[in-house]
Amino acid sequence: MLAAPRELSYIPQPVVSSKQSPRSGLSNRRRESRARQKILLLGLVLMGFVIGLSLTFLTMQVLIKGYKIDSLKRELSTLQRENEQLQLEVARLKAPERVARVATTKLGMVEPKTEQIYYVPEQAGNGKQVQVATTEPSRPAVTGAAPGRQAWWVALAEALHQWLEPARQAGAGV
């Protein structure tokens, strides 16, 4: 009997070279693991450094803003004091005594005499009376002032005098 030759099945086995040993696979893994750990550690150190720089920068920004706020508060306080002083100055300048003194000394105005004061009703039927002072027609209303300044005062006084003259004559005739 003749037998057919058998086919041998061959499964190739990994060839182990003399350079690699079974342990070297583990050491490569350890090296890769250690390299990863070093990279991770370096990344964490860099991240900590960046976070530290960021915190320093933000702290400096907060300090700068704080100094600006303090400066603005001081400026506000100064401006409020100046405002109060200016309000006191305005009140002093508006005082009736000062206005009367300036009117008589600098502007040359005089107090009206009793016979120069006439009471005229403000509006018909209102019942209120307005005090109006006039001057004699021969004298100007304002003396001692510059001609350009007194022109409108003189014109006003003359117009008032002409307007009140009929009422004055009617009051004298009654």
Swiss-Prot record:
Positions of transmembrane segments: 39-59
InterPro entries recorded: Cell_div_FtsL (IPR011922), FtsL/DivIC (IPR007060)
Cellular location(s): Cell membrane
Main location: membrane
Topology of this chain in the membrane: Single-pass type II membrane protein
GO biological process, one term: FtsZ-dependent cytokinesis
Entry's Gene Ontology cellular component terms: cell division site; plasma membrane
Extracellular topological segments: 60-174
Protein keywords: Cell cycle, Cell division, Cell membrane, Membrane, Transmembrane, Transmembrane helix
UniProt keyword rRNA-binding, yes or no: no
Residue ranges annotated as Cytoplasmic topological domain: 1-38
Family that this chain belongs to: Belongs to the FtsL family.
HAMAP family reported in the protein's UniProt record: FtsL
Main function: Essential cell division protein.
Name of this chain's protein: Cell division protein FtsL
Record organism: Moorella thermoacetica (strain ATCC 39073 / JCM 9320)
